[in-house]
């Protein structure tokens, strides 16, 4: 069956295959079809070796899968289904808070498909940002001829910001504070060229104001930094502390340079 499906996919020109509910293939049992297999992970490895044999030249994305073994796929979904609302962004980022390190295991942490329809502008910005700081994003709306005009306009507005898209290089952000009582809403990444990126999400229905010490972000508090908020394009400077205001159900993301 796997060989037959692979032949069909290759004839159709597909280069990407998503494999879902993979954990089911690692379940323990009293016995397996192949009598040489005696554990769930043995069975999983057997199946994944077949997958690699028939789909190894494609981009393979795993969902609801064991973290390990990890060498059969390029990417793994960091959580389960996430859609278009702020609660979905929060859900994705809760998984990122504890799973950001998996970008060292897989080439990409997958935040699930980014859906723009039936959401506010702030929710769209937040959901796209949750994708790029996880490491990659795949658009999930209907862009066919019969698809919604509104969605296509949203896509042109929110999926074509070059500076936002450039962040999605496979390297995940990590939480500023990863062990609080509530979902983490601050994430940071330091790049090798000296740039830093800092994202603040507001999951609430009212405006958020906060002050963040630059030292807490891994920056030198004695230096002055140039900042650019990448959704609005607004530029500013900061030294010692960074004053941040985030509208209700929205996000800000700063590029920080000396």
Where are these regions (language model features)?
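Solvent-exposed beta-hairpin/edge-strand motifs
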Residues: 215-233
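C-terminal beta-strand-rich structural cap/linker in extracellular carbohydrate-active enzymes
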Residues: 237-258
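Active-site-adjacent "subsite" loops/lids of carbohydrate-active enzymes
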Residues: 1-12, 25
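The substrate-binding groove and active-site-proximal loops of carbohydrate-active enzymes
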Residues: 1, 23, 27-41
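Carbohydrate-binding surface patches
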Residues: 131-134, 139, 178-219
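Catalytic cores of secreted or luminal carbohydrate-active enzymes
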Residues: 129-175
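Glycan-recognition surfaces
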Residues: 4, 41-149
């Amino acid at each position: 069956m796997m060989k037959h499906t692979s032949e069909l996919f290759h004839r159709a020109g597909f280069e990407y295959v998503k494999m879902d509910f993979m954990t089911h293939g690692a379940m323990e049992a009293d016995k397996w079809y192949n009598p040489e297999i005696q554990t769930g992970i043995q069975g999983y490895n057997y199946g994944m070796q077949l997958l690699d044999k028939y789909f190894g030249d494609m981009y393979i994305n795993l969902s609801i899968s064991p973290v390990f073994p990890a060498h059969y796929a390029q990417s793994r979904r960091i959580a389960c289904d996430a859609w278009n609302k702020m609660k979905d962004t929060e859900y994705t980022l809760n998984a990122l808070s504890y799973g950001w390190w998996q970008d060292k295991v897989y080439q990409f942490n997958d935040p699930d498909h980014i859906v723009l329809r039936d959401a506010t502008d702030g929710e769209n910005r937040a959901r796209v940002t949750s994708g790029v700081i996880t490491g990659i994003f795949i658009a999930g709306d209907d862009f066919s001829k019969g698809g919604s005009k509104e969605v296509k306009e949203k896509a042109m507005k929110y999926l074509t910001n070059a500076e936002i898209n450039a962040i999605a290089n496979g390297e995940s952000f990590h939480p500023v504070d990863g062990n609080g009582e509530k979902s983490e809403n601050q994430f940071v990444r330091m790049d090798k060229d000296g740039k830093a990126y800092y994202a603040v999400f507001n999951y609430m229905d009212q405006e958020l104001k906060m002050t963040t010490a630059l030292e807490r972000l891994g920056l030198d508090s004695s230096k002055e930094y140039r900042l650019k908020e990448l959704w609005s394009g607004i530029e500013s400077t900061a030294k010692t502390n960074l004053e941040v205001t985030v509208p209700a159900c929205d996000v800000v993301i700063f590029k920080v340079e000396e």
